[in-house]
Amino acid sequence: VVVGDFDSLEGRPPRTDVRTIALPALKDDPDMLSALKVGWSAGCREFHVYGGLGGRIDHTISGIQLMALLARHGASGYLYGDGLIVTAITDGRLSFPAHPVPEDGRMVSAFSHSDVSLGVNEPGLKYELKDGTLTNTVVQGVSNEFRDGVDAAISVEHGTLIVTFPIEVALPQVSRFHEFGGDIGELDTAVSKLLVR
């Protein structure tokens, strides 16, 4: 499925042999959220967004917020770009298998997306935070490091963390501490009602 408003497309429109959902350019939901909603309605609960980092900073921040939205509904999302992966976890754990770590591929960071994240643990990392509290106004989780050949994890008992790690690292196993409900909303194909005409 190809989803978008195609407002920045140069050249020919998308292939006609692929299901295409064309959205109005003057809408409320960004294209990425619309694409996630289409996937969600088809039963997807793990999303990989390539090219979701870099370019416009507002799009990058939007993508990070969407990873948090997915995590808060019990799904997983990964933004890929410039040698980095960004994901989010809510009330759960990301377990990274032991791996050889090149000197330039050690950095892993965790930031609180929620106002407060409680019970944050980072076993196996260079700085092993235990039962910590992170907030979204104080930076405490930046530039931690994987250790060569050591299993590692990042977990949060209550709250949402944004986690960044090198693209060379295998995706973590995700476990959640409880069931999540709800959905991320229905696809909105209408022109924004907030538009000033």
What are these regions (language model features)?
Residues 19, 24, 74-78, 105-109, ...:
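A glycine-rich helix N-cap at a beta->alpha junction
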Residues 25, 84, 115:
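Residues that form or immediately flank small-molecule/cofactor binding pockets and catalytic motifs
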Residues 69-86:
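Short, acidic/small-residue loops that bind anionic groups at enzyme active sites
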Residues 50-52, 80-81, 111:
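Short beta-strand segments
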Residues 1-73:
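Acidic/Gly/His-enriched mid-domain segments of enzyme catalytic cores or analogous surface patches
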Residues 12-15, 42-46, 74-77, 116-121, ...:
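Generic detector of short, locally flexible boundary/turn motifs and exposed helical patches
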Residues 17-18, 43-45, 73-76, 105, ...:
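Short coil/turn connectors at secondary-structure junctions
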Residues 89-197:
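Long, charged alpha-helical interface segments
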